[in-house]
Amino acid sequence: MSVADIRKGAEQKMQRSIDAFKNDLSKIRTGRAHTGLLDHIQCDYYGSPVPISQVANLTLIDARTIGVQPWEKKMVQVVEKAIRESDLGLNPATQGDVIRVPMPALTEERRRELTKVVKSEAETAKVAVRNLRRDANEQLKKLVKDKEISEDDERRAGDDVQKLTDKFVAEIDKLVVTKEAEIMTV
């Protein structure tokens, strides 16, 4: 394994950590509606659990309302029940074959709780990135021990890995600031 392989592997894994963090952030409800909010909700479809997006059309009706239109009429009640029983605290209302999902306004206390959740998720993502840095540095030390690279090369590669770590941690911080602003906006 070469220094370039170690660096590239670390960068790819760090990017995956960022992607997972973005995915976690998208599940945190803000006062604004977005269809991604319902992505992880499963409903029963002929005996097997499937995401709502696979049995219905999801659209934004306005800034605070999501429209869910199941493709099969008999799925309307099933989808509505799945949304109501989710952990998002939503109260869907059916109008014909369209389910309207209004986003309730967040209380100040709930907004503060959500910002704490965001910070906690961010810290978890940062720890994952730092663990990947540690793994890459251990691989570099092994190359030095096996006399495949010099200590100077290890130091340079270690600096590169540190720069990657700093870049991804800064990206996490930027995502946190954006999400907190989104949550705190009334």
Curated annotation (Swiss-Prot):
Domain of life, per lineage: Bacteria
Protein name listed in UniProt: Ribosome-recycling factor
InterPro entries (UniProt xref): Ribosome_recyc_fac, Ribosome_recyc_fac_dom, RRF_sf
Assigned keywords, A-Z: Cytoplasm, Protein biosynthesis
GO MF, any single term: ribosomal large subunit binding
Record-stated family: Belongs to the RRF family.
UniProt xrefs under Gene3D superfamilies: 3.30.1360.40, Ribosome-recycling factor
Gene Ontology BP, a term: cytoplasmic translational termination
Functional description taken from the UniProt entry: Responsible for the release of ribosomes from messenger RNA at the termination of protein biosynthesis. May increase the efficiency of translation by recycling ribosomes from one round of translation to another.
One GO CC annotation: cytosol
CDD domains: RRF (cd00520)
Short name of any one Pfam family annotated for the protein: RRF
Organism: Paraburkholderia phytofirmans (strain DSM 17436 / LMG 22146 / PsJN)
Compartments it resides in: Cytoplasm
